UniProtKB/Swiss-Prot annotation:
Single GO BP term: IMP metabolic process
Source species: Penicillium rubens (strain ATCC 28089 / DSM 1075 / NRRL 1951 / Wisconsin 54-1255)
Pathway(s) of this molecule: Purine metabolism; AMP biosynthesis via de novo pathway; AMP from IMP: step 1/2
Pfam families in the record: Adenylsucc_synt
CDD domains for the chain: AdSS (cd03108)
Subcellular location: Cytoplasm
Name under which the protein is recorded: Adenylosuccinate synthetase
């Protein structure tokens, strides 16, 4: 049976920890979308690991891991990240990681183009990570991309990469990029990659009787190309539908869809953010929560929990359970606000829909409910009944407001065991 972990906001919700926990019983862990633009941190046996392109199921020695067809694959980052986690003690990780031959290759060329495209937008920048993700997915959609399996065919690979280089030079002129240098690097990568590249369908059929398959979402629903705050989104399908498509999942095999919700809201980069707090509360959330991006180091924008957004996310991803993270960051607030409705520019009140037009979203007025804080330390609490009454009331308010979806896990700190599991 399949469990899927998905971000419900704008990313950085803390998906890695629940994935790490669930991977202990998983025999297969898969990434379905995104690339090395994703980022999360796992603290495992007092060692901190930063994951980007690799599935975090690698922390479990019995878990096989797949980077699936919906991803974009930056080869240097793959080997760098693999070496880094093995150097920290995850021995044998290289023998447990595979990549679909249908994933697309993200080149250094794409990163150069990403920067040029962002520069061309001027004040309307999307705020990308600069990793080349958007240009790579653009090449995929335009049917000119290079797939991982083609790396093994030297002649085809080099022809297609040179064609990409020529097409981008036609568009932008001279580039700070040497295609022959990249081709030379791949001559070294080719044999190193070969043991990791698999026919995805064949690979998944070999594991179809896996009692516990875990799908690890990247980014989050509000960064989804179709359902997110377009154009301030990533370039892939980050929700439930994207996971099913990328991994050819049988929907009947899905036993749980876990939405990861930060106890407040953050986003990196540009774009609408209705509950953002450009005040002392936002500053406090940023400082106490240490809200800096794992991938870029950029400071995250912070605001109160937005339940309109969460209801919208649930309506698309159909969560069966929630993991509420970073509850402890709210410990020192006298009062905690929660967004429960939007007042649209035309005066209409909505509680579960998110407008498609970013100009409309920018003019939304958020209706808040103010709840009492608990003013006591929850870090490391491991039993629900040991939480302060007001903290439990906060959690139960969220459950009611998101249609009764149970909050089954509650994060109370950065360590792997700083998690409450409710029956």
């Amino acid at each position: 049976m399949v469990s899927i972990v998905l971000g419900s906001q704008w990313g950085d919700e803390g998906k890695g920890k629940i994935t790490d926990m669930l991977s202990q019983d998983a025999t297969l862990c898969c990434r379905a979308a995104g690339g090395h633009n994703a980022g999360h941190t796992i603290v495992h046996e007092d060692v901190t690991y930063d994951f980007h392109i690799l599935p975090s199921g690698l922390v479990s020695p019995k878990c096989i891991n797949l980077i699936g067809a919906g991803t974009v694959f930056h080869v240097p980052s793959f080997f760098k990240e693999l070496a880094a986690i093995e150097a920290k003690g995850l021995k044998g990780a290289a023998q447990r990681i595979f990549v679909s031959d249908r994933a697309h290759v993200c080149f250094d060329l794409h990163s150069v183009v990403d920067g040029l495209e962002e520069k061309g937008l001027g004040g309307r920048k999307v705020g990308t990570t600069g990793k080349g993700i958007g240009p790579c997915y653009s090449d995929k959609a335009a049917r000119r991309g290079v797939r991982v399996g083609e790396i093994l065919d030297e002649e085809t690979f080099e022809r297609k990469l040179r064609t990409l280089d020529t097409s981008y030079r036609t568009r932008f002129g001279d580039l700070a990029y040497d295609v022959e240098e990249e081709i030379a690097r791949f001559k070294e990568y080719r044999n190193l990659l070969k043991p990791h590249i698999v026919d995805q369908l064949e690979f998944l059929q070999e594991h179809k009787n896996s009692p516990n398959t875990l799908v690890e979402g990247a980014n989050a629903l509000m960064l989804d190309l179709d359902h997110g705050t377009y154009p301030f989104v990533t370039s892939s399908s980050t929700g439930l539908g994207g996971a099913v498509q990328a991994l050819a999942l049988n929907p009947a095999s899905i036993k749980s869809v876990i939405g990861v919700v930060k106890a407040y809201t953050t986003r990196v980069g540009s774009g609408p953010f209705p509950s953002e707090q450009l005040n002392g509360d936002g500053e406090k959330l940023q400082q106490v929560g240490r809200e800096f991006g794992v991938t870029t180091g950029r400071r995250r924008r912070c605001g109160w929990l937005d339940l309109v957004l969460c209801r919208y996310s649930h309506a698309i991803n159909h969560y069966t359970a929630l993991n509420l993270t970073k509850l402890d960051i709210l410990d020192d607030f006298d009062e905690i606000k929660v967004g429960v409705a939007y007042i649209l520019p035309d005066g209409k009140r909505t509680t579960g829909t998110f407008p498609a037009d970013p100009n409309v979203v920018d003019k939304i007025q958020v209706e808040y409910v103010t709840l009492p804080g608990w003013k006591s330390n929850t870090m490391g609490v491991k039993r629900y009944e040991d939480l302060p009454p007001n903290a439990r009331a906060y959690i139960e308010f969220i459950e009611r407001e998101i249609g009764g979806v149970p909050v089954k896990w509650i994060g109370t700190g950065p360590a792997r065991d700083h998690m409450i599991a409710r029956d």
